[in-house]
Amino acid sequence: MIPDVSQALAWLEKHPQALKGIQRGLERETLRVNADGTLATTGHPEALGSALTHKWITTDFAEALLEFITPVDGDIQHMLTFMRDLHRYTARKLGDERMWPLSMPCYIAEGQDIELAQYGTSNTGRFKTLYREGLKNRYGALMQTISGVHYNFSLPMAFWQAKCGVTEGEAAKEKISAGYFRLIRNYYRFGWVIPYLFGASPAICSSFLQGKPTTLPFEKTDCGMYYLPYATSLRLSDLGYTNKSQSNLGITFNDLHEYVAGLKRAIKTPSEEYARIGVEKDGKRLQINSNVLQIENELYAPIRPKRVTRSGESPSDALLRGGIEYIEVRSLDINPFSPIGVDEQQVRFLDLFMVWCVLADAPEMSSDELLCTRTNWNRVILEGRKPGLTLGIGCETAQFPLPKVGKDLFRDLKRVAQTLDSIHGGEEYQKVCDELVACFDNPELTFSARILRSMIDEGIGGTGKAFGEAYRNLLREEPLEILQEEEFIAERDASVRRQQEIEAADTEPFAAWLAKHA
């Protein structure tokens, strides 16, 4: 089932320097909660500056949903320590609040209680909040409080030069983008390995179902927790953060222009369902527009091709201008065993898997084939640890045992690991392979199995509160390592100043400004 990558691996072993200079970045979302686990109702902490303009600390959907962002980094330890400093400083500034250590929220009874993230009075800030109002009215606020980790990854120019002979200009843009699209297609085919290993949301609180009927064979504990005994990541299931109305958009990952055309089509295609919500009611705006996507960011995807945007530029226009610059992996649950929601083992695994995905052959995929890849993901998400589970290839009928496919993949990853270790010295990447490959013979080692044991004993709420309390105490005690307190204060003040400047520069009323941007 695994494509034959032996030639590409042999090439890599002859050109190890092609992997020198991989760049990465991390984003981590987490809810601010009170000591009893309920959602914090306070505004974004003043000590953290302006969520609109802060470089490292912002908010996602809700005012209480923090998001930490590391700068682009070539050094794994440095990146993780930077992320830890953001958590250390924030933990000290949250008073009695703490950061929820799980992807799935628990003590939120009704979506209406969730305050949308606020970004001030500028047109840009109000637009961001209106976009969130639209998300709430379309999908419900509860779904939007699910949190995850995003891993951003780019290969060095040396890789593309060695692999495709490119230097710069239009030809380089096309070839590099084609290489990243190959990575993305392989991710759709084989990325289910991520929830298998690292999924950590095998259970949900009953409030999440909100009385909606479900066909899933949930088991229920006395404290109202619903779980599937072999599930890995309900966050990635239809109960979690997905968007069924987007499954037939026909967006494909074969070609830059085709992909962008699909995205642009979706933001212009009217939706009957969203038109029923209305765009405005009693003088209050309910969504930016009633199209299938209000803006491009609404496209739900487990992985995204990206380029840093210039001022006023849409993500797709940035891609057209310069091609794909990096990849954003969006399938990681919060790692509940790490105070910062992600750890070194995961980052090293993702490095290996990304390199494998870019090396392995990946025939072009129609939108139908793309939908077929969802079958494997759904199996792993809902019953990934089930004995005897099999997976298929795309829309074909042949089936293969998951443990065998996983071990075959890791045979390749081990060779990539040897190459990466040869550049960096040590055996860190190979060690990660040895640790993780054991999860295929023993699913009890996976994150989902480990956290489910705790959840069955303590409930989701009890588990979240215990871990959250322990991490709060730990982070508050640890000294900062990379950033100094003065740098946090300087960025707080600078971010507030930047927000004020944006607000002062606005001359156009919001309604007129929105008419141009909606």
Curated annotation (Swiss-Prot):
EC number: 6.3.2.2
Cited Pfam families: Glu_cys_ligase
Top-level taxon of origin: Bacteria
Coiled-coil segments on the chain, per record: none
Biological process terms in GO annotation: glutathione biosynthetic process
Catalytic activity: L-cysteine + L-glutamate + ATP = gamma-L-glutamyl-L-cysteine + ADP + phosphate + H(+)
Keywords linked to the UniProt accession: ATP-binding, Glutathione biosynthesis, Ligase, Nucleotide-binding
Pathway: Sulfur metabolism; glutathione biosynthesis; glutathione from L-cysteine and L-glutamate: step 1/2
Signal sequence coordinates: none
GO molecular function (one): ATP binding
Top EC class, one word: ligase
Record's GO cellular component terms: cytosol
Alphabetized HAMAP family for the sequence: Glu_cys_ligase (MF_00578)
Family in the record: Belongs to the glutamate--cysteine ligase type 1 family. Type 1 subfamily.
PANTHER family: GLUTAMATE--CYSTEINE LIGASE (PTHR38761:SF1)
Protein's UniProt name: Glutamate--cysteine ligase
Biological source species: Salmonella typhimurium (strain LT2 / SGSC1412 / ATCC 700720)
This protein's encoding gene: gshA
